[in-house]
């Protein structure tokens, strides 16, 4: 069998695809897996590390507000569709799986026209425009949140939860060994701050407010992912940081970092929250305020209601509010332990099994024809 995974641009779309692909490869080692992405997406550096071939499509995100930039990028859509048809006709995959992102739409759409079995996964409670269009055409729609059913017109909707790479679960179960490997002492706290694959200005501002306090606490370690665009400026601004404060552009080995943390400060994208839950890490969640339908705040509230996180709105991140929210958590290890336990209960742990089962069911008719 040959499988094509289309998804990327950001980690939120790419990592669920990688989780499914890894799981499939474990149970079907002889099957061929290809990824389709975009020239500027995070997949260019991440996918090769997992050993999967990557095909690039010339397509970019289209801004929701009408402008000359919107029209310019719309001209790329027909080209990307043509390239998607050419690619699929050449590779002849048995199934196409889309997890959102710029490359997902043209590849999945072309696959539906070519009558190739198709599955899409929608990460958020408020589906994106591309997946709303595709939902009526594909063979199966997998959803993280059941309430997304109200916003999608499709025959075969499945509430599967969000797939997470197995390393998160494995490393969470071996947390003490992971902390030793990172050099985190028994009496030390590890704070991890990140804002997605591109970073987040607000997260960086929040960490800046906390740095003087971190300097005064020798038992507090920090891994701070600034985002590639902000790294050089912040590196110049905060010179001579102690060794226990590690500033990096991006955490590309997140399964080896996040499960070791005592507290995370991050946005509230669905994929990030699934990884936090799999890692059993409490969090301070600062939802991206411009997400469609404010879906990140909705995601965050699910964690808050389970006692696994604290919510800070972007507009509320003044220095006083940040310190009043986060410092008491760092002073309450017992509370962090309880929040960590609650975080581990939020996530469905059978997502990969259910999604791969749906894929296998779609492929059965093809298997029968070949035998």
Curated annotation (Swiss-Prot):
GO terms for biological process: carbohydrate metabolic process; cell division; cell wall organization; lipid glycosylation; peptidoglycan biosynthetic process; regulation of cell shape. It is an enzyme of class 2 (transferase). One of its GO terms (molecular function) is UDP-N-acetyl-D-glucosamine:N-acetylmuramoyl-L-alanyl-D-glutamyl-meso-2,6-diaminopimelyl-D-alanyl-D-alanine-diphosphoundecaprenol 4-beta-N-acetylglucosaminlytransferase activity. The keyword DNA-binding does not apply. It is found in: Cell membrane. UDP-N-acetyl-alpha-D-glucosamine binds at residues 10-12, 124, 165, 197, 251, 296. This is UDP-N-acetylglucosamine--N-acetylmuramyl-(pentapeptide) pyrophosphoryl-undecaprenol N-acetylglucosamine transferase.
């Amino acid at each position: 069998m040959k499988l094509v995974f289309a998804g990327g641009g950001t980690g939120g779309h790419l990592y669920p695809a990688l989780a499914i692909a890894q799981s499939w490869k474990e149970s079907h080692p002889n099957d061929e897996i290809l990824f389709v992405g975009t020239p500027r997406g995070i997949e260019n550096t991440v996918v090769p590390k997992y050993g999967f071939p990557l095909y690039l499509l010339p397509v970019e995100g289209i801004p929701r507000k009408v402008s000359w930039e919107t029209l310019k990028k719309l001209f790329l859509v027909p080209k990307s569709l043509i390239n998607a048809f050419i690619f699929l006709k050449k590779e002849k995959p048995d199934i196409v799986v889309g997890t959102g992102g710029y490359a997902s739409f043209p590849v999945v759409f072309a696959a539906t026209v070519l009558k190739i079995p198709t599955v899409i996964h929608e990460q958020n409670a408020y589906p994106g425009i591309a997946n709303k269009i595709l939902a009526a055409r594909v063979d199966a729609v997998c959803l993280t949140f059941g309430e997304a059913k109200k916003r999608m017109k499709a025959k075969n909707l499945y509430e599967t939860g969000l797939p997470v790479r197995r390393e998160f679960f494995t490393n969470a179960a071996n947390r003490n060994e992971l902390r030793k490997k990172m050099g985190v002492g028994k009496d030390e706290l590890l704070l991890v701050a990140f804002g997605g694959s591109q970073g987040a200005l607000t997260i960086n501002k929040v960490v800046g407010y906390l740095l003087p306090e971190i300097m005064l606490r020798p038992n507090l370690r920090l891994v701070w992912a600034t985002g590639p665009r902000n790294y050089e400026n912040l590196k110049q601004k905060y010179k001579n940081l102690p060794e226990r404060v590690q500033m990096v552009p991006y955490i590309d080995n997140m399964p080896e970092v996040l499960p070791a943390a005592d507290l995370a400060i991050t946005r509230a994208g669905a994929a990030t929250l699934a990884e936090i839950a799999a890692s059993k890490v409490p969090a301070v969640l600062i939802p991206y305020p411009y997400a469609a339908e404010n879906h990140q705040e909705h995601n965050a509230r699910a964690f808050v209601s389970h006692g696994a996180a604290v919510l800070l709105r972007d507009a509320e991140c003044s220095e006083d509010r940040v310190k009043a929210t986060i410092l008491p958590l760092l002073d309450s290890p017992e509370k962090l332990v309880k929040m960590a336990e609650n975080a581990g209960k939020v996530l469905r742990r059978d997502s990969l099994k259910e999604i791969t089962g749906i894929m296998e069911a779609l492929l059965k008719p093809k298997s029968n024809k070949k035998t």
